[in-house]
A protein has these predicted regions:
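Active-site glycine-centered loops adjacent to acidic/histidine catalytic or metal-binding residues
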Residues: 65, 132, 169
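Canonical P-loop GTPase G-domain recognition
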Residues: 1, 136-196
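Conserved protein kinase catalytic core
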Residues: 33-34, 71-74, 110, 138-139, ...
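Charged, alpha-helix-enriched surfaces in structured cytosolic catalytic cores
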Residues: 20, 77, 81, 111, ...
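Residue-level signal for inorganic ion chemistry
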Residues: 51, 132, 179
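Conserved C-terminal guanine-recognition region of P-loop GTPase G domains, centered on the G4
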Residues: 58, 85-162
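Conserved G1/Walker A P-loop phosphate-binding module
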Residues: 1-73, 188, 193-204
Length: 204
């Protein structure tokens, strides 16, 4: 697995297709425009990027910006290496507490999105889906997109796998409170009952 910081605090990964808006979501959530570089060229983020969430001068969690998947301009070898590293991280990282999957509401869930949901489902990691660019839809279209996504996910809610969905717009700040609440629910139990010693060395 790629070199990562010690697994001493809960981590939440932000995943999705290239240019889905992962970096922008992290920037909006943290209220820092340039915290995670938001590129207009898909495939720009090619490494795992870790961002600490600080409370009272202490890190209580990390947000992890994963490289976008499925971008056609990436060389096949690069895509293979990415798949291997991502798979290793998702399968082995002990501090993972949840996955935020960002999906363009105008396109809906695609094949690679379903693959990721199944992938993290093997570890029973909760998935929270952001239907991004919701500001592009009127209210009726937003409701229909939300319902369609919920219905499409029913077959994946097996063995109690937690999958939740919300509307999201970084531009209009749609869904900010809902997202913050969801992430807090994931982090707080993990903070109160940590599975990993604070002094665990970095994984490489």
């Amino acid at each position: 697995m790629v070199e990562c910081p010690g697994a001493s605090v809960p981590e939440i990964v932000f995943a999705g297709r290239s240019n889905a808006g992962k970096s922008t979501a992290i920037n909006t959530l943290c209220k820092q425009r340039q915290l995670a570089y938001a590129s207009k060229m898909p495939g720009r983020t090619q490494l795992l990027n870790f961002f600490h969430v600080i409370e009272q001068a202490e890190p209580i969690a990390r947000l992890v910006d994963l490289p976008g998947y499925g971008f056609a301009q990436l060389a096949q070898t690069s895509q293979s290496v990415w798949d291997k590293e991502l798979g290793s991280y998702l399968a082995e990282r002990p501090s993972l507490v949840g996955t935020v999957l960002i999906v363009d509401c105008r396109r809906g869930l695609l094949e690679l999105d379903y693959a990721l949901i199944k992938w993290v489902g093997h570890r029973q990691l909760p998935v929270h889906i952001l239907l991004s660019k919701a500001d592009k839809f009127n209210r009726q279209e937003q409701v229909l997109a939300l319902r369609a996504t919920q219905k499409a996910l029913d077959p994946y809610r097996v063995n109690g796998h937690e999958i939740t969905v919300q509307l999201w717009s970084a531009l209009k700040k749609i869904g900010m409170v809902e997202l913050e609440t969801q992430l807090s629910n994931w982090v707080r139990p993990a903070v109160s009952t940590p599975d990993t010693p604070e002094n665990e060395p970095p994984t490489s």
